[in-house]
Amino acid sequence: MKLIPFLSEEEIQKLQEAEANSSKEQKKTAEQIEAIYTSAQNILVSASAGSGKTFVMAERILDQLARGVEISQLFISTFTVKAATELKERLEKKISKKIQETDDVDLKQHLGRQLADLPNAAIGTMDSFTQKFLGKHGYLLDIAPNFRILQNQSEQLILENEVFHEVFEAHYQGKQKETFSHLLKNFAGRGKDERGLRQQVYKIYDFLQSTSNPQKWLSESFLKGFEKADFTSEKEKLTEQIKQALWDLESFFRYHLDNDAKEFAKAAYLENVQLILDEIGSLNQESDSQAYQAVLARVVAISKEKNGRALTNASRKADLKPLADAYNEERKTQFAKLGQLSDQIAILDYQERYHGDTWKLAKTFQSFMSDFVEAYRQRKRQENAFEFADISHYTIEILENFPQVRESYQERFHEVMVDEYQDTNHIQERMLELLSNGHNRFMVGDIKQSIYRFRQADPQIFNEKFQRYAQNPQEGRLIILKENFRSSSEVLSATNDVFERLMDQEVGEINYDNKHQLVFANTKLTPNPDNKAAFLLYDKDDTGEEEESQTETKLTGEMRLVIKEILKLHQEKGVAFKEIALLTSSRSRNDQILLALSEYGIPVKTDGEQNNYLQSLEVQVMLDTLRVIHNPLQDYALVALMKSPMFGFDEDELARLSLQKAEDKVHENLYEKLVNAQKMASSQKGLIHTALAEKLKQFMDILASWRLYAKTHSLYDLIWKIYNDRFYYDYVGALPNGPARQANLYALALRADQFEKSNFKGLSRFIRMIDQVLEAQHDLASVAVAPPKDAVELMTIHKSKGLEFPYVFILNMDQDFNKQDSMSEVILSRQNGLGVKYIAKMETGAVEDHYPKTIKLSIPSLTYRQNEEELQLASYSEQMRLLYVAMTRAEKKLYLVGKGSREKLESKEYPAAKNGKLNSNTRLQARNFQDWLWAISKVFTKDKLNFSYRFIGEDQLTREAIGELETKSPLQDSSQADNRQSDTIKEALEMLKEVEVYNTLHRAAIELPSVQTPSQIKKFYEPVMDMEGVEIAGQGQSVGKKISFDLPDFSTKEKVTGAEIGSATHELMQRIDLSQQLTLASLTETLKQVQTSQAVRDKINLDKILAFFDTVLGQEILANTDHLYREQPFSMLKRDQKSQEDFVVRGILDGYLLYENKIVLFDYKTDRYDEPSQLVDRYRGQLALYEEALSRAYSIENIEKYLILLGKDEVQVVKV
């Protein structure tokens, strides 16, 4: 097909005019059309939340394909695998539709080829592209194509630790061991070992992994801050700050003397006020920095006289108290600023004095880091296992050093497209530059939604292009999508009101002006005053709680407020639970949130990443069991195992056993005492009674058998032996939240199996890996279990990005920002390099013996202070963007929920606004989201803000005021039905009383069971069923049926029945994670989770399962997982025509897709068959019952029914 020319500027303008004048209900905006059709230059699309950026990308791709571009000529990078899958699905539908609509034969054929090539298109994450690239071109760097990815954090940690200790030993024993020893001591802290240094090394390594060339950055930028340090300039800046602070203080005191001070004539503090004014008055234009510093020192000294009371207005007159309080508050603020400046003078002096020593330390650190980076790189090459960042580095290395490879890709790609460009890091940006020909990049993103700085994403990459393209269109085209098609006008107005007053270039990194403001465009949502954004505050005054306490009472007060609103939405407005989302900035309070919701019976599902897997009780018990098997001399682990439900020793029994003597008096341990207790049991019956002796013998025998088994079997087999020997897996399943506990135990076995497949063998190394993960204060992700279908969503703001919910609650608005990075011993900057705290040893000059002769002083280097300021601004900017993402998730209504003392909050005063923004100090002194919202509410009281705050006290949050969750009946989700089992039991008891009466009156009906499964009904009715003249399977002679003369199998190997295979296949289909890409490897891992024997697993053909998902029905299921229901139980009342009795039909539907006006029902069958019609006939009646149950439940008549036949070598999907 010939390439059709792209649209000119004039043609695009005509298209925009035609669209504006069209009668379409939902029109494309002029900017969307511009973004879809503009070509032949670099394009940056700044797409605000809800502006349809995915639609624009898909339309642009479709337009290019329709003009003759091949799908293989497009490089399309998405931020997540899920986003790539969704884009492919959207393109598949659009291309298919275009094929149907066009009459052009050439275009049909061309688009048909693109549709066929779509699965192989370069649409995916950067990581997926680099993996394929290195697999193809890695030979250029001597990298084997069968490399693997170090996705397991624990395996990565083991490798890092091993390499660290190798490099550490080399430096510690090397020529520069004295300077290295100084470096080691600088980070040793209280531990006085290498852990402090190791922590900083790993932190710097993670930072380096986001640079395009780690070694180059280390050599060129790591010491840049030391090289350009200018203390003269810093002193001048500090002097200017001192001048300004002294002038501010002078202005404040003079205003006070001229006004309020007249009310306090002859008050003692006024003399000291005048004294300070005289000191400041001694300064003039000729005064140098020394003079200013001297005045500052005298002023600060006066402010500290009499513990600060020298300048305090101590008036106790009731009518003058507000004036006195206001003066004292401002005075404290002014002198706190002066005190900080006084400290900075001293710090700057120390920084200059120890600059040379700190630089020397930094050079030693640079040398160590360089060796570590190279050693770790080589070690990973030996293992042929890499992190994703390594793959990217090698890809860049090949593209930079092999021009023929780079040019082939630049010629191949007609356009290089990237989604979520605001979250790009420097290594990704370099790769995009190398793949592009310089003028064919299409970048879509929104800097206001850049929230991944902790992953080294740099929003300034986006911002730099935004500014450059805006100022010089020749550099590239800037297109701004402002219209929001997602949210109500109430949500958008509240969001604009907040960020117009909060975000600017100084704090926020962008000016929130008309280029960034959200514009309402969802014409389907009409304005509704009830949807005005609500800023809800739990009033702590009612409970008298302390400001900083984090008690459960306080949190449940806030949660009760939320629960009240949820119940109101659900019960008064009919809002489904799944339409409500609870967003948090972190998961630290999730346990208490979940507890509060469960107390009121509100179903909830989390984002599945609690990261507290190793803290779960059942996993801790198993880890202690493994520790004891490895080394029984560990007392803590041994006691934990003995007290666990597996053996159940109580305190009395353990005390009796611990009173035994040990062989080793110096290092006595419990295990030796147990051995001795076993030997001496017969002679110490008073201490070791018979029952205890038998219990101890059983424990020691089982432990010995496990230890022996561990020597000859895999970890996976050992763990399952423990589960089976002591029925531990079954035991935890009977506990509250049993399925989740069992899933955790499953995961432990699987993780042990993965560990041993990663070139690490043995129980010892597995335990050491777990201990290292715990020591590093990391954890493994918790295992997700099937969530309820209709449930409130609880997730972090990061996880909510890209999602939307009708009603959004932003919780914990009062939770303080995480500032751990700014308290670290090391702060890095891409521009300045290393900032470090130097530990200086100083002579005290003390003569007396009881005074220390030397002290250690922690001195932040000049670069550290500069990096700290840069980090503070970047952190506050990111927090603003995080709040923006959270607020723009809401479609209809937004709730911002916090807590605080009403009295304290309402008494707070703030500086006046400047240029329509909060004062920069107000913004930078905020500790949390709530501080910003409250300050806006107070400073802009005259503005008609589109959100309102409201305090809610304890009197409004009693159990009666909140209410209860009303129970409802029609076809409930099984998770909610479980909450009402007590009602079912009561009904059952009432029915049992009448059993005898029913038996007497309805004897004829007794032959028909009252509760049946569809298969039972089929068997019961087979003699009389008439399925439109079709013969019932199993009746009469089967035509053409082959007769088998095979000898019976008398072998001793395990027999596998068809029922076992069928049951295992059904469980496998239920467990498959459809959100991930399906591969043979992923199915193999899922199969391991199926509760069956290995013999049955061996009989399941995974290729056939994989083939099913390539069928039309399989693809429809993958594309519509939001509509998918699997393994759904149902019950239905039917009447037997012979006895005229009602009976209940119960069963489990394999799965169905629920659409608005249609249901697609499917059922898996593993029966053997000759012709599909045999199984269609056999199961037609069963599917008819399923159809009837669904039709009754959802009032939908249009139901398609499919049998998925897995009984032959090839899968068949048959419509019934």
UniProtKB/Swiss-Prot annotation:
One annotated GO biological process: double-strand break repair via homologous recombination
Known catalytic reactions: Couples ATP hydrolysis with the unwinding of duplex DNA by translocating in the 3'-5' direction; ATP + H2O = ADP + phosphate + H(+)
Deleted gene: phenotype: Cells lacking this gene grow poorly, are more sensitive to UV light than wild-type cells and have reduced double-strand exonuclease activity.
Keywords: ATP-binding, DNA damage, DNA repair, DNA-binding, Exonuclease, Helicase, Hydrolase, Isomerase, Nuclease, Nucleotide-binding
Residues engaged in binding ATP: 47-54
Required co-factors: Mg(2+)
NCBIfam families, per the entry: addA_Gpos
Subunit structure: Heterodimer of RexA (AddA) and RexB.
Assigned protein family: Belongs to the helicase family. AddA subfamily.
Name used for this protein in its record: Exonuclease/helicase subunit RexA
Gene that this sequence comes from: rexA
